[in-house]
Every structure is written in C-alpha cells, then in structure tokens.
Amino acid sequence: MADPTTYRPAPGTIPTEPGVYKFRDENRRVIYVGKAKNLRSRLSNYFQDVTQLHPRTRQMVFAASSVEWTVVSSEVEALQLEYTWIKRFDPRFNVKYRDDKTYPMLAVSTGERFPRAFFFRGPRRKGVRYFGPYSHAWAVRETLDLLTRVFPMRTCSKGVFNRHESLGRPCLLGYIDKCAAPCVGRVSEEEHREIVDGFTSFMAGHTDKVTRKLNADMMAAAEELDFERAARLRDDLEAIDKVMEKQAVVLGDGTDADIIAFATDQLEAAVQVFNIRGGRIRGQRGWVVEKPGDYAGLLVDATTQPEGDAPETDPALPFLMQDFLVQFYGDAVERAETEAKEDAAVIERRGVDKHSFEEAAPVTRASVVPREILVQVAPNEAEQTLKVLEELRGAGVDARVPQRGDKRALMETVERNAKELLKQHKLKRVGDLTARSAALQELQEALDMEQAPLRIECTDISHIQGTDVVASLVVFEDGLPRKSDYRRYRVKEAAGDGHSNDVASIAEITRRRFLRHNQDKLAVPEAEEFDGSTFSDEKVEEMSTDARRFAYPPQIFIVDGGAPQVAAAQEVFDELGIVDVVLIGLAKRLEEIWLPGDPDPVILPRNSQALFLLQQIRDEAHRFAITYHRQQRSKRMRVSELDSIKGLGQSRRTELVKHFGSVAKLKEASVEDISQVKGFGPKLAEAVYEGLHASK
C-alpha cells in the first residue's frame, strides 16, 4: 500500500477548474472516481494529515498509488462524466446503487410465440417485459392468481407446454378457465396475443380502460340473456377490484411521481423509492449502501431519532441525493432504451406482433423519469442535477421538496420506511460485523500479516473417480462472499481418461488464476483518457469473466488440502513471481492450516472466529465446485445417442424426439417410419436407423 505523500501532485499543478478525478491502485485499476467544482480545493483534502481523514477515505488513499484528473467545461459535464466513469470502471470505493437481484418481479415473455406470465427474480432477460418490483413474493403470485381469472394467458413453462401439446389435452388451469389453453389450440396465436395485451395493459396502469370494457361486456351479456357469461364477467370485475384495492389511491390528482427519501448513520445510508403512477403506488424499492469517505463523517443517526421530533439534517444528504438521482435514472433510461431495441427487433422478426406492442404501454425515457420527483432534501448542485435529469427524460422535470398536504404526508411515510430499512440492516449487521472483524484480526495475527486481509480467495477440486474434474474459485471481501468474482474451471492438463491428480490439479488452477492476473496487469494502459464514449458503448461480457473485476490480488489464497497441495501451489507462486499473497492450505480432517515450507501446521482454537471464517470459505468453495461438477456430469449423462449421428443437427434431433416421444420409441421405428418425419428422406432415415442400432 502506498503512502499518499509519494504520489501527491506538486503544489500548483492541480487546476482550479471543474473536473473529474480518478484514484488508481498499484495495478492501475481505478478505485475511486469523484467530481469537483474546484479540483485543487477538493484534491488537497485527500492529502492532509491522514489521521484527520474518515477511515474509509484513509483506506482509499492508502490503497491508491496515483491520482489523475480531467478538466471539463461545466459542472453539468463533470456530473455526467463522473457517472460515465463509475459505470465504466466500477470503482470499489464508490457508492453504487445496484438493482437488488432478489426483488420479485412479474414477468411476461413477450418474445415467445405464446407469451407466458411468471414470477421472476434475477437479472433482466431479452424478450421479457417486467412489472414491479414487488416487496414480497406472495404479492406477485396473488396478483397473477387474480388476473389470470380475467386474462387467462399461459403461465406454464416451456416443458409443461410442450408436454400437454403432445398429449393433446390441457393442464388443470385449462379446465378451470384460468388458462386459454393455446397448447391444444383452444385459442389461436392472435387470440392469445389479445389476452396478453389486456394483461400487460392492465399491469402498465391502464386499469380504467379494462374495467370499462368488462362492464360494457357484462351489460351486453345481460341484455342478451347470457347470464352465465355475465356472471363470469362480474367475477372478473371483482378480481380486478381486489387487485386495485392493493393499489389504493394515495394522490387524488392522479400524479405520476417518484418519492425518494434517505435515512443515514455515521457510515451507511438507506434509501427508499416509492413509484407513484396515476396516483397509485406501483412499486417500492430500497437499498443500503456505505457512505463515500468524502462525506461520511460523525453525522446524525436517523434510526435513533425519536418519532415525531424534527431530525437534524445530515450534511451528507444533498450529496447522497445527487449521486442517487444521477445513477438511478441514468441506469433506468439505459435499461429502457435496451428494452425498446429488443422490442423493435421482435416486431421486425414477427410482424404479426406489431399491433400488440403498439397497444402496450411503451417504455420511454418519459415513463422511467417522471415529470415530478419529490425528494427529501434538494440535491447538491440542484440546478446542474436538474439539467442532467431533463436530458435523461428529454423533457422538463420538477424535482422539489414537498412542504404540505398529501405529498408531504407521503414523503414522511417514505422516510419512515427508509429508517426502518436502515434499522433492520443495522440489527442484522452488528453481530455479523463484530464477528467478521474479529475473524480478520485473528487471521492477521495467526499468519503474521502486516494488515488484516481484505480479500481472500479459495479453490477446491471436485470429481468422481477422475471423471468430470472441475475446480472452483470463490472470493470473500471483508469476510463476505463476492459472488460476482467467483470462477469455475474444467481441469484440463491434470485430469482425463478417468484419472485425476488432486495435487497437479491445484497447481494447474493456481497457475491459471495468477497467470491471468499477471497478464491483466501488463495489459492495462498507463492512462485512459475519456474519449466521449459511454459505458453502454463498450462490450462487456455477460458472465462474470470481466478481467478488470478479477484482477485485484487476494491477500490470502487458500487451497483445499494439506502440505502436498500447498507445496504445489507454492511452486507456481515461485514460477510466476507472486510474493505479495499469503498462501495457506486448510486440511479437512483436523482443520489444520498449512503454510509453505513449515513442517508443522498452525492450529487455531476450536472457538476461533478466524477458523470459523476459513471453514465458511472452504465450504463455499466446495459447494460451488460440487455444484459445477454435478452440472457437468448431468450434461454428459444427457448426451443422446442421436448426437453421434452425422448429418443430424439439433433441429432434426428435436423433430425426431417430438414425433416419436422418446429415443426408446424411435429405436422401435423402421426406416420407413422415420422417413415419414418432416425433413427426413430415405437416406437420412437409414443413417438414423443404422446409427441407433449400431450403438447397441
């Protein structure tokens, strides 16, 4: 770690104009991005007496080894460039309001021939439209249960759909009229798409249009003396009313607005966002993040403020609000534009769906950045922040602090939710943080390290009698798993033909991990100047293989095993010149810690927090490895006898299995039977027959 005085810019060299600055570590990785009205004034704060800095800021300046800056023409441009660089470099000391992947959503697979509605958690996919997020999983399922009475669209998986299509009879939902049963042709593709349109239109907020239509249809059915249909439509309206009851009107003027409030303590901040559309609460989201060191001082703890008292204003709130507004709406617009492109591609590919997409509420910049944004406090640099929001929306934005009436009352509700979120987070975190800090401190002492380890990596090998040999690499930072940095490997050199050498496998995985790390360091340019591109312009791999996120070296590298495994990994370290990583082995039987070259292991007390953490990391590596091994083994066992037949592609294999029902039944078929399948001539049918029977 570098002493800040070693890279402090010379006096007078820092400009006084607005700009954006980057701190880099010794591997040239960007670890912090900030903006300033006056670069000299802001950067000078980082190089004062380090004992006066906030602990997080102090950690950052010691982790850095250089600082760079870019002068811009205005504060608005500085705000935009800061956001772009945070997206581009993903600096570890910046606050990032990432979407919580655990929020439940209601999804509609609009890209399928027969779209389906389903409960969903996780990152967004192409060709799927999302509604939510919801605060609870049961809320999604209850909404889906009620609305499928009115809009009986498909909700089953592809496998269930195909099975009932081949059986020629619908599932239970088809019999109780909660699915239109497109699998058996009860409705056409166009008719099912109309049902989907009604569902998505309702979920998009066009509720009045839906209820008016149902009322008109019910009255028409009654006039025609079709009382059975009228009763069914009445039940549909009751189901709609139940859904609407859960979305009570909170603003009588039908406002579209987002309401945003924070609760803070000395180190962390919780933010809550309520999405109001048409005067109703349509969504709610929350995050808890660490405060950046720039403004994480000894400030007000909102969770201890007595109810009803006017809280002191946290000086960090305007800065937090500015960061959140730019990041949250910048990400939302980027996501909306991506989804719009995907929808356009679907329309182009399936012209019959064009009407359906036009009927559905379009996802536009104006729909994700509402006209009105109600905030707890005015953001820092309010005028510049408002300009950025207006550019994102493409129209005017009114961002203000509500002072009275329903909007003020709703803001107080959002504030209470933010306080409760922070309170629950702190209650959960207190025990965890104390134990993690003690564990890292004990590890530092037991392994004679200069500082407590920030990042720990562990690898494990998994196989059954030398088959499907794989390895895992898990990463823990501050004693918590960092799953975005997990890796999995197929062992190549040290295994094959039914044999495996665990010691050689450890050496191979260690070499692949740290060879890549060295290559990454060599590949980083000396400096990266902003070229006008945005984060979305760059190609980023969807899987967690982004080299920039993987290049941070661990302070401790754990191999699962004893002295032989440690010795093998140490040989690789010596070969690659790795000297700044502590290597240890954790033997399963007695939980002994083996160090390179030491004849005796280190024994930690059984009640040691450090031992518990090491066990947790080792067990996580084992879990991740064995999960991957099972996937590989299952994949190998699913290999069909049809795969080895030349000239038989995936689509034709699928057609054969679909026609005959299974490979076993296909084996009973004659050449003539096979030639009756669409796309199979006598020559190919004979090749299939011979291929199947030659394998006996």
Curated annotation (Swiss-Prot):
GIY-YIG domain location: 16-95
Entries under PANTHER family matching the protein: UVRABC SYSTEM PROTEIN C (PTHR30562:SF1), UVRC/OXIDOREDUCTASE (PTHR30562)
Keywords tagged on the record: Cytoplasm, DNA damage, DNA excision, DNA repair, Excision nuclease, SOS response
Gene Ontology MF annotations: DNA binding; excinuclease ABC activity
Subcellular localization(s) per the UniProt record: Cytoplasm
Gene Ontology CC: cytoplasm; excinuclease repair complex
Domain UVR per the UniProt entry, residue ranges: 208-243
Gene of this entry: uvrC
SUPFAM superfamilies: C-terminal UvrC-binding domain of UvrB, GIY-YIG endonuclease, RuvA domain 2-like
Matches recorded under NCBIfam families: PRK00558.1-5, uvrC
Name of the featured protein: UvrABC system protein C
Origin organism lineage: Bacteria, Bacillati, Actinomycetota, Actinomycetes, Mycobacteriales
Quaternary structure and interacting proteins, as annotated: Interacts with UvrB in an incision complex.
Similarity section: Belongs to the UvrC family.
General function of this protein: The UvrABC repair system catalyzes the recognition and processing of DNA lesions. UvrC both incises the 5' and 3' sides of the lesion. The N-terminal half is responsible for the 3' incision and the C-terminal half is responsible for the 5' incision.
GO biological process, one term: SOS response
Domain of life: Bacteria
InterPro entries given in the database record: GIY-YIG_endonuc, GIY-YIG_endonuc_sf, GIY-YIG_UvrC_Cho, Hlx-hairpin-Hlx_DNA-bd_motif, RuvA_2-like, UVR_dom, UVR_dom_sf, UvrABC_protein_C
